[in-house]
Regions:
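Acyl-donor (CoA/ACP) binding surface of acyl/acetyltransferases
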Residues: 1-25, 67, 71-187
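DNA-binding alpha-helical recognition surfaces that contact promoter or target DNA
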Residues: 30, 54, 144, 148
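An amphipathic alpha-helix signature
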Residues: 22-29, 49, 53, 57
């Protein structure tokens, strides 16, 4: 488990480890249940306090993933969440995801900063070799965001997830740790 006082700081936002506090729980529930966030997740059922706390215990606090609350630098206001899930220490990889829960914060370049800070943690602190992301094909903004930050498309997954009675396509993108990218001579 991460030190609860840890901060990964950028220009506009910083990341701090999620806690099981009432504030973090209420924010996650509100954000994940909002119509601007929920449609972009595979798990579409309403989030509950009990379900969220179980997730924290079984996944985050058990070391199977890392989840951060994203806060504004200027006033410490929580505005979203970022995470690395399905952490595989042997293969040194994890799945990346994030969301900005506060609508007013969208369109300010914060998503790009969150991605950069999360990759800094993944590659420099966890020493991951690879980070991947599965994104619904009908979410071009997220695909564009990760692609602009060094993620490359590895697969287009047709009818990958059955969500709300409809099969949806997904795009699998990944980024190799820049410190480990092989040159042509090394291949």
């Amino acid at each position: 488990m991460l030190d609860p006082n840890k901060r990964i700081t950028g220009k506009q936002v910083y990341l701090r480890p999620i806690t099981d506090s009432e504030e973090d729980t209420n924010n996650i529930i509100r954000w994940r249940n909002s119509e601007t966030v929920r449609p972009y997740f595979i798990y579409q059922k309403p989030f509950t306090v009990e379900g969220h706390k179980q997730w924290l215990e079984k996944e985050i606090f058990a070391g199977k993933g890392f989840q951060f609350i994203v806060c504004r630098v200027e006033d410490d206001k929580p505005i979203g969440c970022t995470y690395l899930r399905d952490y595989d220490a042997h293969s040194r990889k994890a799945e990346y995801g994030m969301f900005i829960g506060e609508q007013i914060e969208k369109g300010k370049g914060i998503g790009t900063e969150i991605l950069g800070l999360t990759m800094e943690f993944a590659f420099k602190e966890l020493k991951l070799h690879k980070v991947f992301s599965r994104i619904f094909a009908d979410n071009p903004a997220s695909i564009h965001s990760v692609s602009n930050n060094g993620f490359e498309q590895e697969a287009y997954l047709k009818d990958e997830e059955f969500v709300n009675g409809v099969y949806r396509d997904m795009v699998l993108l990944a980024k190799i740790n820049p410190d480990e990218v092989k040159t042509e001579e090394q291949k």
